[in-house]
């Protein structure tokens, strides 16, 4: 018995001794030499890479591959076999698995849904309900960014997270004291889309995943994935939010009000996504800080953090090429630049051909005189945009920013013809469209509880057309110009961690010019209007773990009309349990600038809308129509269910907009040239179900709405809205086949748009000396349902430790479904007693491909 005790003691001692021996670290150079002798191999390495490294010896029973795996796990070096004898040792192309736990600095609570991304890539994950995450195949020399809305982001080097024991680090995020509007859903529909607690949606372009059919994170195309947001004619220059027209959307770029949104006259977003870091879309319950946009607010913000190393990227697709740079100048000063230009004026891709055909339907480019053959017509189109932002941090408490943005579309249309002297001559018509914006911002932190913001902006929009009409030897010149300047001052007082008070003042001056000149007969008309607006606003924002309330009011004073408009705002969300919440939103809003269509062939028939300013019957010109200030009242109520990355969102809404004009709606019936004011009323329900995980995301959205006009002077006075889309369904599925390979497939189905038929058997009538179409009851018929299936694929790859690339391919309308998006009628030139039907078609099968490199 005594001997047994000594034997057990001796075994424990021997095991302890061996354990201590194995845990002792020895120089890596010695280990390499012993491996070379044992396995008859040769290591190739730089002496300085290994000389200062000491690790535990590998197990003596390991084979060669197990031994190399041990070295790889214990060092930051990459041991790689070239053949049966030679092994390379380097610090290049080392891939790691990174793990960690994200917690709040305030209470050490885990942060569920934090975003963890490898910088300059689309690769990332979200933390689980314990705040834990794991990222595989991460380059050693890369950086990861950990972010969570409502908290300050952290950027961490992958190398700093390495440890021999494979222990996951704890990463602490500090609360961002500037906002109580916390994130509600971290991965909404796709990577980079998030939903805030106030119901607004945030699009983070740098982290944005793919959507069906898109090869770029097109800002205004992407937001159409949201329920209640769509374009009835496939144009981002005509985004309809809850039944509203495009001019009823307030579009801001770094606090600069923009009046133009699309390249290719509506098919491509005019806002370069590479430096546009965040886009917030609000449909209701808007902060009292914002006015205009009686349908929605689309607020874009560029990157606002100083970079300490040069970063940038270049990209190309079948339409355009672009580049961007983030340039550190000093520790306190940086410059961000971006630019994009199409090459459509010297290369016509299949994508360009489809876009061209879609954009210029019914324009003079496709419907001009039959006396001029197609061989005698030519056109040249190109677009470009650029942005620049200067960032200066005086210190941690005072930050200054200056911005510039420029957007341009240019179209030349040339016609060759035979003149009266029987000589060949040519005329070139031109259309140019530009929006230039300048802005500045000063953010000041005066204490832990008080901050201020001062903003000023200048925005100029103009569309100019020179139209040579060969048949009548007439030159028509048209111009529409908008010039707006504004200043805004905000102050935010933080009472405690749950309650904020926002106060502010805003001043804006807007001038709009419309000019028309005709050469034969000679005619000139120039009209310019100016309107000054003063506004004060205030709102309280409260948020705790159960209740979120934002209540505010905005008072607008229009100096020209001596008119005051009060705008209350409400945004309320009550959490009933960990899964269920109720929400209630409401707002009054107004806008003084709207778009109208005078004639369908204005501006070559390509961009026939022009901006005008409200006059409130305050014009001395008897030819001026009455243009009131548009005013909206909106309310919505709904509930949310959110559990295990499954989101169910149902919301009923009601919206009434008064002060619209007939010319503002673009009628194709008897009301086309009528001067009248009226309103529209839309009510409906939005439904969304969204399931996400680290490898996939799928969603189904459905909107039912009824949208009716009311014009007292028309007969009938009440009839369906031009964009009365009763049913709209969107379905999509994203899946990560591999860590660096993602596919997306989705479809759209919606009811056909209303249109007006001529009276059967009496299709035309005389109106004075003219024969016109005799339309039946307005908007009493509907086009066939719209259906489209889109697909995309994205492949990410590493060119080096510091350079990454992505290759994307996408197809719009995979099955080449022919959809009619508009229908109207004209008098038949060969038989004036009948009318001919004209259909505008949607995009056919349209492929695109893009290649992007970031460094």
Regions found by a protein language model. Name each.
Residues 399-452, 460-483, 524-527:
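Flexible loop and strand-edge segments within Gram-negative outer membrane beta-barrel domains
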Residues 319-343, 361-412, 434-451, 495-499:
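Transmembrane beta-barrel wall of Gram-negative outer-membrane proteins
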Residues 543, 652-656, 675-760:
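Gram-negative outer-membrane beta-barrel transporters
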Residues 32-39, 75, 82-119, 143, ...:
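Short, acidic, small-residue-rich periplasmic hinge/interaction motif at the N-terminus
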Residues 344-346, 350, 356, 749-766, ...:
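C-terminal beta-signal and adjacent terminal beta-strands/loops
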Residues 453-457, 624-675, 681:
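Membrane-embedded beta-barrel scaffold of Gram-negative outer-membrane proteins
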Residues 121-132:
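Short, acidic Ser/Thr/Gly-rich low-complexity loop/linker segments typical of extracellular
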Residues 72, 126, 152, 159-169, ...:
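Periplasmic N-terminal accessory/gating domains of Gram-negative outer-membrane beta-barrel systems
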């Amino acid at each position: 018995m005594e001997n047994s005790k000594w034997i057990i003691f001796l075994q424990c001692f021997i095991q302890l001794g061996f354990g201590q021996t194995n845990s002792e670290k020895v120089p890596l150079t010695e280990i390499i030499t012993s491996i070379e002798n044992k396995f008859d191999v040769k290591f190739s390495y730089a002496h300085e890479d290994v000389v200062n490294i000491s690790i535990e010896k590998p197990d003596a029973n390991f084979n060669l591959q197990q031994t190399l795996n041990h070295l790889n796990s214990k060092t930051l070096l990459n041991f790689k076999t070239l053949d049966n004898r030679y092994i390379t040792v380097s610090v290049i192309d080392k891939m790691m698995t990174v793990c960690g736990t994200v917690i709040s600095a305030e209470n050490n609570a885990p942060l569920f849904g934090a975003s963890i991304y490898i910088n300059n890539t689309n690769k990332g994950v979200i933390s689980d309900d314990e705040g834990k995450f794991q990222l595989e195949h991460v380059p050693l020399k890369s950086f990861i960014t950990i972010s969570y809305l409502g908290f300050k982001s952290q950027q961490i080097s992958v190398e700093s997270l390495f440890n021999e024991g494979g222990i996951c680090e704890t990463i602490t995020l500090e609360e961002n004291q500037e906002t109580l509007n916390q994130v509600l859903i971290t991965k909404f529909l796709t990577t980079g889309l998030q939903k805030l607690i106030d119901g607004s949606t945030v699009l983070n372009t740098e982290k944005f995943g793919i959507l069906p059919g898109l090869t770029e994170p097109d800002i205004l195309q992407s937001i159409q994935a949201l329920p209640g947001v769509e374009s009835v004619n496939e144009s981002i220059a005509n985004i309809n939010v809850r039944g509203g027209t495009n001019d009823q959307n307030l579009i801001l770029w770094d606090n600069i009000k923009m009046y133009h949104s699309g390249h290719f006259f509506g098919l491509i977003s005019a806002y370069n996504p590479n430096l546009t870091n965040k886009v917030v879309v609000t449909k209701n319950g808007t902060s009292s800080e914002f006015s205009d946009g009686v349908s929605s607010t689309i607020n874009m913000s560029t990157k606002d953090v100083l970079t300490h190393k040069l970063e940038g990227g270049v990209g190309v697709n079948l339409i355009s090429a672009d580049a961007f740079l983030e340039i550190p100048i000093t520790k306190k000063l940086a410059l961000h630049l971006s630019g994009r230009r199409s090459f459509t004026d010297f290369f016509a891709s299949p994508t360009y051909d489809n876009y061209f055909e879609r954009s210029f339907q019914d324009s003079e480019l496709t419907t001009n005189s039959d006396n001029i053959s197609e061989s005698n017509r030519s056109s040249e189109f190109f677009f470009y945009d650029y942005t620049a932002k200067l960032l200066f941090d005086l210190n941690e408490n005072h930050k200054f920013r200056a911005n510039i943005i420029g957007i341009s579309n240019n179209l030349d249309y040339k016609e060759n013809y035979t003149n009266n002297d029987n000589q060949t001559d040519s005329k070139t018509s031109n259309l140019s469209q530009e929006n230039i914006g300048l802005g500045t911002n000063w953010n000041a932190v005066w204490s832990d509880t008080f901050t201020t913001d001062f903003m000023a902006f200048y925005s100029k929009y103009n569309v100019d057309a020179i139209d040579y009409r060969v048949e009548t030897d007439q030159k028509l010149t048209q111009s529409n110009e908008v010039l707006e300047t504004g200043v805004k001052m905000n102050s935010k007082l933080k009472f405690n961690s749950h309650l904020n008070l926002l106060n502010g003042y805003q001043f804006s001056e807007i001038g709009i010019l419309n000019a028309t000149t005709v050469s034969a007969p000679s005619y000139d008309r120039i009209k310019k209007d100016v309107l000054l607006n003063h506004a004060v606003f205030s709102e309280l924002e409260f948020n705790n773990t159960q209740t979120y309330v934002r209540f505010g009011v905005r008072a607008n004073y229009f100096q020209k009309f001596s008119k005051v408009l009060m705008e209350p705002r409400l945004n309320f969300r009550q959490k009933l349990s960990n899964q269920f919440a109720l929400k209630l939103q409401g707002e009054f809003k107004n806008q003084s600038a709207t778009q109208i269509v005078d004639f369908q062939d204005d501006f070559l028939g390509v961009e026939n809308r022009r901006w005008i300013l409200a006059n409130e019957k305050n014009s001395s010109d008897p030819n001026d129509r009455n243009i009131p200030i548009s005013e909206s009242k909106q309310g919505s109520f709904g509930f949310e269910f959110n559990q295990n990355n499954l989101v169910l969102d149902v919301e009923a809404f009601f919206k009434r907009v008064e002060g619209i004009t007939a010319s503002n709606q673009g009628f194709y019936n008897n009301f086309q040239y009528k001067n009248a004011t009226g309103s529209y009323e839309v009510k409906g329900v939005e439904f969304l179900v969204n399931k996400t995980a680290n490898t996939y995301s799928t969603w189904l959205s459905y909107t039912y709405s009824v949208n009716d006009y009311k014009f007292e002077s028309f007969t009938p006075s009440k009839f369906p809205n031009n964009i009365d889309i009763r049913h709209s369904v969107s379905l999509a599925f994203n899946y990560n086949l591999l860590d660096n390979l993602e596919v997306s497939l989705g479809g759209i189905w919606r009811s056909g748009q209303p249109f007006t038929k001529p009276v059967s058997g009496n299709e035309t009538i005389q109106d004075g000396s003219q024969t016109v179409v005799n339309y039946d009851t307005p908007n009493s018929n509907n086009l066939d349902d719209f259906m489209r299936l889109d697909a995309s694929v994205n492949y990410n790859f590493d060119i080096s430790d510091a350079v990454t690339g992505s290759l994307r391919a996408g197809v719009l309308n995979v099955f080449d479904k022919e959809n009619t998006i508009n229908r109207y009628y004209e008098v038949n030139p060969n038989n004036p007693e009948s009318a001919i039907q004209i259909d505008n078609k949607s995009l056919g099968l349209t492929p695109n491909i893009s290649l992007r490199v970031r460094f």
